[in-house]
Amino acid sequence: MAKELIFGHQNPDTDAIGTAIAYSYLQNKLGYDTEAVALGEANDETKYALNKFGFTAPRVIKTASNEVDAVMLVDHNEPQQSVSDIDKVKVTHVVDHHRIMNFNTADPLYYRAAPVGCTSTIMWQMYNEKEIEIPQDIAGIMLSAIISDTLLLKSPTTTDQDKEAVEALANIAGVNYKEYGLKMLKAGTNIADKSEEDLIDLDAKSFELNGSNVRVAQINVVDLPEALERKEAFLKAMDEASKSEGYDMFMLLITNILDSDSEALVVGSDESKAKFEKAFNTKLSDSEVKLPGVVSRKKQVVPPLTNAFEA
């Protein structure tokens, strides 16, 4: 059987990398020849999780077709979020928990998606269905992914399935998930040593909304006022990125992981800003607005933006 690469989205988070590792282990147990790779360097939070459970970060690839003919995707499906030459390889499997958009294939494939908080929750279910024993390190990295995506089960995306998976995986991994989870999340909040340009690209995704190219980035912090001291520098970096990459709107969500509130910074045309204001029923003040209780890009940001841009 020919080798296949497994990877998550660009600017990978803990779910994108952790689930790729877990899926590669599962598929290899089932007779496939796979390797987990990444479409970018691991962030600080992910590095903390990888180190905790004894993994080295997957190697980073820029293209896939120079290595393999087929790939498996986790934690994404939209082509603009995938490897640059996704149109040159065959997608044989997808496991995801996001909306399906601009995705089509020439051949039938395995596609599994569910509205849960994290792709690793689906992966945990797949291990159980296949009756494949989950090793301690794999359990740990899947646990880390769920904690990351659900903000320690506090995100509105959290489901009973996520909670069940966390309990089971923490037991296998041998950790107190609340204590470990808080340490892991805090490891990803150190922004002092990073440039604004790096921060707005660390966890960012592009969305095509009714012909508009919308970029939504998110950074997690424990000190929101400190992060907002860099507001003007953030806006400058966002504006420059929009001009160079052709974004019609760039939104940066700065989320306080301790109180589950966010502040949004927005750059773009007057028309796109008006659509942002309509989406969240609010008014921007100097390109900034508070978004109380908003922590999930997938559930609380993209759906209202989609509705506003398509209205």
UniProtKB/Swiss-Prot annotation:
Binds 2 manganese ions per subunit. Pfam families: DHH, DHHA2. Mn(2+) 2 binds at residues 15, 75, 97, 149. It is found in: Cytoplasm. GO terms for molecular function: inorganic diphosphate phosphatase activity; manganese ion binding. Coiled coil: none annotated. Its EC number is 3.6.1.1. Its cofactor is Mn(2+). Keywords: Cytoplasm, Hydrolase, Manganese, Metal-binding. Its main location: cytoplasm. GO terms for cellular component: cytoplasm. Mn(2+) 1 binds at residues 9, 13, 75. Gene3D superfamilies: DHHA2 domain, inorganic pyrophosphatase (n-terminal core). PANTHER family: BNIP - RELATED, MANGANESE-DEPENDENT INORGANIC PYROPHOSPHATASE-RELATED. Belongs to the PPase class C family. This is Probable manganese-dependent inorganic pyrophosphatase. It comes from Lactobacillus gasseri (strain ATCC 33323 / DSM 20243 / BCRC 14619 / CIP 102991 / JCM 1131 / KCTC 3163 / NCIMB 11718 / NCTC 13722 / AM63). The lineage of its organism: Bacteria, Bacillati, Bacillota, Bacilli, Lactobacillales.
